[in-house]
Amino acid sequence: MEISTSILSVKKENAIQTFYNLEVAKTDYFHIDVMDGKFVEQNTMLYMLEYATTIKHISNIPLDVHLMVDKPREQIEDYIDLKPTYITVHYEAFKEEKQLEDTLLYIKQNGCRAGISIKPDTSVEKIYPYLEKISLVLVMTVEPGYGGQKLIETTIPKIKKLKTYIEENKLECFIEADGGINLENIEKLNEAGIDIAVVGSAIINSNNMKETIQKMKH
């Protein structure tokens, strides 16, 4: 299992040192939470792009971009030049199937892996038709918008169901879980079948980032 560290709670005055510490701690990805103040209440658009650009200049750790926005296409254009490994858009942000499919294609045409994210209340069956076209499903294990929330336990059976479907249909699609993940509950998610865990507060606020990340990986 890989760890994608959310930098949502990183303070600007400590940002560069924190990014360096996370690289030394061997995070697998930097998770970039892009919020527009519309799809979710919080707005991180300006400083997240600044953070992502800084990381690209000082680190070789890949970026994992999660767009929690009403108009994903506009934000994708901001991030494409940074060559993130993943750009993930929310299923709920699209009114029409064609809009979603066109957006996924646009991400892939620009050299990134496309992902779809779903909120805790969205059933996994709704994204089954898209699984052949994407590399990642991001299952929100809290309501999107804020860090430091408690994991919603009812999302775990949803992850198991998704994992079974992917394996039965021999699909090449990873599962990522995001929200409320810590040392106490990460093993449940590992057993449910996730490939990548997005972890924020539990790493950023720990006394030893490297030790915390290594414990989470094993």
Predicted regions located by residue number:
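Glycine-rich, proline-tolerant flexible connector loops at the mouths of alpha/beta enzymes
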Residues: 30-49, 91-93, 142-148
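Alpha-helix-loop-beta-strand connector modules within alpha/beta enzyme cores
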Residues: 45-65, 106-115, 155-175, 179, ...
